[in-house]
C-alpha cells in the first residue's frame, strides 16, 4: 500500500518528544535521520541515533488527512503555527516482500553467521544469530555492520560485558552474546529498536543476558569491556565525551557508520583517550578500533 511521509527538523534533545507527537497524530512508524550525514539504511531508514541536528520522519497511511495532522502538530509547544516540514507521497510497493526475498544467511569472520529466521541455517556448528529485524533495523547487509560483526568475531569475548551504543535490531549485542560475552547492554533512541532488539534476543535465547535502554533510562556510570557504536560520523564526534567513558581502562572500542573520508575527524575525537588501530575500510566505509589508555 502507498504511504505518506512527514519530515521535520529538530535537535537530538527534542527528537524523542516530537516522535511521540507524531505517533499521537497518527504515524505508524518513526525514523530518526542525521540531517547532515548520509544515513545508514539497512535496508530502510532507522539506524541513525541521537545527535545535534536531526530529521524526525513520520510514516502515515495514504488515506490520512495530512492537513489534520499538521493542525494537531501546530499545537505542540516545540513546533507552533506554520512549523517547517515536508510531506511526500511514497511509492506503492510491497517493501516487506521485496526485503524478505533479498535477505539471505551471511557469514562474518571465522565463526559467525547472521541468518533470517525464515531461512535454513547453513552451518549448524557455527555461531548462528537468527534475525528478524523488521523493515527499519540492521540486518548485516550494510558494510558498516559487516565491519563491526567481523571485529566482534575476532575478539575473545568470553565472560566480557559489551555495550552496543545505537543497537537498532540488536544484531551486534546479540552476536556478542552468542560469541561468548557474559552480558550485553543495548542503547537506542528509538523505542521500536528496543522492541526489535528484545524480540531478536528472545529468538536467540539470550534475553536474560541483554539489558536494553532508551538514553534517558540508562544507568549512570555504565562500564563495559567492549563498546561498539555503529552510528554515523556526526554523532560519533558529537557524542565522543559520552562514548569515551563507557569502556573500562584497557577496554576495547569499535566505531563504524563512518565514511572513509570522515575517518580522520572521528579519530581526532577519540585519540586522546584511546590507542587507535589502523583504520579498516570496506567499500567507501570504514571501522575505527582502539584500546582505552
From Swiss-Prot:
GO CC annotations, alphabetized: cytosol
Cellular compartment(s): Cytoplasm
Main location: cytoplasm
Protein EC: 2.1.1.-
Domain of life: Bacteria
Gene Ontology BP term (one): methylation
Residues reported in the UniProt entry to bind S-adenosyl-L-methionine: 145, 166, 188, 230
Presence of keyword Nucleotidyltransferase: no
Metal-binding is among the record's keywords: no
Pfam families per UniProt: PrmA
Catalysed transformations (reactions): L-lysyl-[protein] + 3 S-adenosyl-L-methionine = N(6),N(6),N(6)-trimethyl-L-lysyl-[protein] + 3 S-adenosyl-L-homocysteine + 3 H(+)
Keywords for the protein's UniProt record, in alphabetical order: Cytoplasm, Methyltransferase, S-adenosyl-L-methionine, Transferase
InterPro entries reported for this sequence: Ribosomal_L11_MeTrfase_PrmA, Ribosomal_PrmA_MeTrfase, SAM-dependent_MTases_sf
Uppermost EC category: transferase
Gene3D superfamilies attached to this UniProt entry: Vaccinia Virus protein VP39 (3.40.50.150)
One Gene Ontology MF term: protein-lysine N-methyltransferase activity
Protein family: Belongs to the methyltransferase superfamily. PrmA family.
Chain's role: Methylates ribosomal protein L11.
Protein name: Ribosomal protein L11 methyltransferase
Amino acid at each position: 500500500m502507498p504511504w505518506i511521509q512527514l519530515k521535520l527538523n529538530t535537535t537530538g534533545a527534542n527528537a524523542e518528544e516530537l516522535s511521540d507527537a507524531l505517533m499521537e497524530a497518527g504515524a505508524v512508524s518513526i525514523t530518526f535521520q542525521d540531517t547532515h550525514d548520509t544515513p545508514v539504511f539497512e535496508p530502510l531508514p532507522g539506524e541513525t541515533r541521537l545527535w545535534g541536528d536531526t530529521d524526525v520522519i513520520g510514516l502515515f497511511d495514504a488515506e490520512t488527512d495530512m492537513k489534520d495532522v499538521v493542525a494537531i502538530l501546530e499545537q505542540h509547544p516545540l513546533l507552533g503555527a506554520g512549523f517547517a516540514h515536508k510531506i511526500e507521497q511514497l511509492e506503492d510497493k510491497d517493501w516487506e516482500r521485496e526485503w524478505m526475498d533479498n535477505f539471505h544467511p551471511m557469514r562474518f569472520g571465522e565463526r559467525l553467521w547472521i541468518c533470517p529466521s525464515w531461512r535454513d541455517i547453513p552451518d549448524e556448528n557455527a555461531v548462528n544469530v537468527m534475525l528478524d529485524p523488521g523493515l527499519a533495523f540492521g540486518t548485516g547487509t550494510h558494510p558498516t555492520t559487516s565491519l563491526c560483526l567481523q571485529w566482534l568475531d575476532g575478539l575473545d569475548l568470553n565472560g566480557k560485558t559489551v555495550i552496543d551504543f545505537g543497537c537498532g535490531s540488536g544484531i551486534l549485542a546479540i552476536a556478542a552474546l552468542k560469541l561468548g560475552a557474559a552480558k550485553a547492554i543495548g542503547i537506542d533512541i528509538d523505542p521500536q529498536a528496543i522492541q526489535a532488539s528484545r524480540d531478536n534476543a528472545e529468538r536467540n535465547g539470550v534475553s536474560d543476558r541483554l539489558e536494553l535502554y532508551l538514553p534517558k533510562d540508562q544507568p549512570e556510570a555504565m562500564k563495559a569491556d567492549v563498546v561498539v557504536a555503529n552510528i554515523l560520523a556526526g554523532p560519533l564526534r558529537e557524542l565522543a565525551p559520552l562514548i569515551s567513558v563507557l569502556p573500562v581502562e584497557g577496554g576495547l572500542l569499535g566505531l563504524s557508520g563512518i565514511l572513509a573520508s570522515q575517518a580522520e575527524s572521528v579519530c581526532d575525537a577519540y585519540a586522546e583517550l584511546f590507542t587507535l588501530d589502523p583504520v579498516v575500510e570496506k567499500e567507501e566505509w570504514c571501522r575505527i578500533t582502539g584500546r582505552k589508555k
